[in-house]
């Protein structure tokens, strides 16, 4: 029989399967990557038990819980837990604090299915606290290298090629600009933070001399980078990625147009997917219209509509280059040039994709 565990580091480093027995609403507010929600009580049952606990105390609340979850419903839930336990003999279960709900699930599994299955002591709350501490410790003690560069230089491509890199935009499911929204929704803030902390933990444990991250604002779409981590990034050495204007236009076309269209069409089908993709581009352009000014916004919107029409009616994507070129030259490049000037003292290396990738691999290696 395996013992209950409080070794959170081992759980997250090994990707141990975990069964979350909290109510679905609790799970939706924040969970860990790969965990499976198989609740002891659903949201309404938990609500009723909570009211009973507040009014009549723990004993009455436990009795009500047993009356609500009984018979065929109880048997179904036990069967689901047993299936998980058999499929993941190395796993664990947990509730919010690792207390009564976890213990009841353990007892029912033991009594009704003959399965001894360990729990995580301290539950979700303790594991969440551990991951918050991981970020704080990394910000205090870990060296970072920050990858910067103009829009379209391929920073995300470099991040994917450096083993010590943490893909902040991948974890946030957002490319980090007005045009950065993906077809898939962003994770909940807490889920983003949990995934980020686990990623940082795994790379720090691997012994890399420095972790590599892309230069980001405090927010990636609607997700907020932990303040201590972002502040550490602002004080860390920078590497500046360079690429020709033509290369950048092609990369923006690939990622922000063709890739975005493919994501939406795969998700919604050719007609609804294309319309959702077109709406996403229009909305992004509108979002930066106050900074573009009315004349430039009108010109870019017209170019965008012409490109969307060509793409929809004839499958042509080349016309998108027209608005991409104007947007890069007149909007993003001046903005990044200003940012580059402010950060010039922090830049320790410059180069193209191959040179920067090699430099980052060497300087971050174990």
Curated annotation (Swiss-Prot):
CDD domains given for it? RHOD_YbbB
Q: Which domain of life does the UniProt lineage start with? A: Bacteria
E.C. designation(s) = 2.9.1.3
Stored SUPFAM superfamilies: Rhodanese/Cell cycle control phosphatase (SSF52821)
- BP-aspect Gene Ontology terms: tRNA wobble uridine modification
Keyword Transferase set for record? yes
Record-annotated Rhodanese domain positions: 12-136
The record's active-site residues are 95
Q: How does it assemble?
A: Monomer.
Q: Which HAMAP family does this entry report, sorted A to Z?
A: tRNA_sel_U_synth
Q: Which NCBIfam families does this entry report, sorted A to Z?
A: PRK11784.1-3, tRNA_sel_U_synt
Q: What is the name attached to this protein's record?
A: tRNA 2-selenouridine synthase
- Organism, per UniProt? Cupriavidus pinatubonensis (strain JMP 134 / LMG 1197) (Cupriavidus necator (strain JMP 134))
């Amino acid at each position: 029989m395996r013992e209950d565990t409080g070794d959170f580091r081992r759980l997250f480093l090994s990707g141990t399967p975990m069964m979350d027995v909290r109510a679905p609403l609790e799970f939706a507010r924040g969970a860990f990557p790969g965990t499976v929600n198989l609740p002891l009580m659903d949201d309404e049952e938990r609500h009723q038990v909570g009211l009973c606990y507040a009014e009549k105390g723990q004993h009455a609340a436990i009795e009500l819980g047993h009356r609500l979850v009984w018979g065929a419903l109880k048997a179904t839930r036990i069967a689901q837990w047993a299936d998980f336990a058999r499929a993941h003999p190395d796993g664990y279960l947990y509730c919010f604090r690792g207390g009564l709900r976890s213990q009841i699930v353990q007892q029912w599994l033991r009594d009704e299915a003959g399965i001894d299955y360990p729990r995580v002591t301290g539950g979700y709350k303790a594991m969440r606290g551990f991951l918050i501490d991981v970020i704080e410790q990394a910000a205090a003690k870990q060296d970072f290298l920050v990858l910067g560069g103009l829009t379209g230089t391929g920073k995300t491509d470099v991040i994917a090629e450096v083993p010590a890199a943490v893909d902040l935009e991948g974890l946030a499911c957002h490319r980090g600009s007005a045009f950065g929204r993906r077809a898939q929704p962003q994770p909940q803030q807490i889920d983003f933070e949990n995934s980020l902390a686990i990623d940082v933990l795994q790379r720090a444990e691997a012994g890399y001399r420095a972790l590599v991250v892309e230069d980001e604002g405090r927010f990636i779409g609607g997700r907020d980078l932990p303040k201590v981590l972002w502040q550490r990034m602002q004080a860390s050495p920078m590497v500046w990625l360079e690429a020709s204007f033509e290369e950048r236009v092609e990369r923006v076309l690939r990622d922000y147009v063709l890739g975005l269209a493919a994501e939406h069409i795969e998700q919604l089908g050719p007609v609804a997917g294309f319309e959702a993709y077109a709406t996403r581009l229009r909305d992004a352009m509108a979002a930066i219209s106050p900074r573009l000014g009315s004349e430039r916004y009108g010109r870019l919107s017209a170019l965008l509509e012409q490109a969307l029409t060509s793409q929809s009616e004839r499958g042509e994507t080349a016309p998108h280059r027209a608005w991409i070129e104007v947007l890069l030259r007149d909007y993003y490049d001046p903005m990044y040039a200003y940012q580059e000037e402010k950060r010039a003292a922090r830049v320790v290396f410059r180069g193209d994709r191959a040179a920067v990738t090699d430099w980052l691999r060497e300087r971050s290696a174990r």
